[in-house]
Amino acid sequence: MNAFTQIDELVMPLPLEPQGYTIAPSKQSPRLLELTFARETVEAFVQAVAQWPVQALEYKSFLRFRVGEILDELCQGTLRPVLLNTILDRASGGMLITPVGLDDVSQAEDMVKFTTACAHLIGRSNYDAMSGQFYARFVVVNSDNSDSYLRQPHRVMELHNDGTFVNQITDYVLMLKIDEKNMEGGNSLLLHLDDWEQCDEFFRHPMARREMRWTAPPSKKVAEDVFHSVFDTDAEGRPTMRYIDQFVQPENYEEGIWLNALSDSLEGSEKKVSVPVGVGSFLLINNLFWLHGRDRFTPHEGLRRELMRQRGYVAFPKPLYQRGQ
C-alpha cells in the first residue's frame, strides 16, 4: 500500500489492500489521505444500522463502538488499522473521508452514524457541552450575532486546535458537512505543525511552556476556566499544540505580544492548505499536530451550511504527552 510507506511504526498491521473503500493522497497535500467508500459499502452499512436511530447512539454509548465494528466488518477488517495508523502517523495524521451516496441533508442521520463509526474505530468522542451530546450540529447562515467566530461566515476563522478550554484529552477532531446552499468559498484551512515555517522558533520560546488561562464564551456552556501552555511535546519530544486565539487570556503585556506574534505567524504561513469538503464528506485529523480553520464565504442572502463535529481521544494505544494532555 504505497499510501502508507511513510508510516515508520505501525500500531496495528496494515492490510495488503483496502476492501470496500479506496485510498489516495489528497491533491491539496500529500500528508492528507482521501478515503472513498464504495456506494455498495455505504448502502450495506446504512441497512445494517437502520435498527438504531441516532438517539440510540446518544443513549447507549456502547452502540457507537458496535456501528464501528459493523463498518469494519463490511471492509473485511481492513478499516480500523488504516484509520488508527493514519491518525497516529506524525507524517500524515489527516484524512478526508467520503462515503459515496451520502450526499443529501435528508440523510443527515446516516451521516452521523457513519462518522460515529469511523471515530469509534480509533477512540471515543468526548461529551460536547455546547450540544449536550457526543457530537454537535450547528448552522452557518448569512448573518450572525453569536459570541464566537464559529458561525460568522464573512471572515476567516483563524487556525486553531479544538478542546483548548476543556479538561479533556482531545486527540482528534472530526468535521462533517451535512448541507450547504448558495455557497461560494468557505473551504477548510489546515496547517501541519511540521510544515509551519516558524514552528521551531515559537516552540523554543520561553512563553511556549508558560501556563496560560483559557476561557469560553457562554454559547460553549463551559463555566470553568482551564490552565495549560500553548505548546507541549509528544513522547518523542516533537511539538504539539493546544491553541485558539479567541479563548486564551494573556495575563500581561509580554504574553499578549507573544500570542499576537504567534497568531500572525500562523495566519501568514504559506504552508496552509485549502481543502474543499463536499456534502457528506468529513475531515478526521490529529488535533495535536494539525491546526484547522475556515476560509470566508461570499455573502448571499440564502447562504446556509450545516456542520457536525466530534472530538475525542485515541484509545489504541494511548498517545503519550509530556504535560497537560
Swiss-Prot record:
Keyword Oxidoreductase attached: yes
Superkingdom of the organism of origin: Bacteria
GO BP terms in the entry: L-lysine catabolic process
Any one Gene Ontology molecular-function term assigned to this protein's record: oxidoreductase activity, acting on paired donors, with incorporation or reduction of molecular oxygen, with 2-oxoglutarate as one donor, and the other dehydrogenated
Positions contributing to Fe cation binding: 160, 162, 292
Catalytic reactions on record: glutarate + 2-oxoglutarate + O2 = (S)-2-hydroxyglutarate + succinate + CO2
Top enzyme class: oxidoreductase
Pathway(s) annotated for this protein in UniProt: Amino-acid degradation
Quaternary structure (record): Homotetramer.
Family: Belongs to the glutarate hydroxylase family.
Protein name listed in UniProt: Glutarate 2-hydroxylase
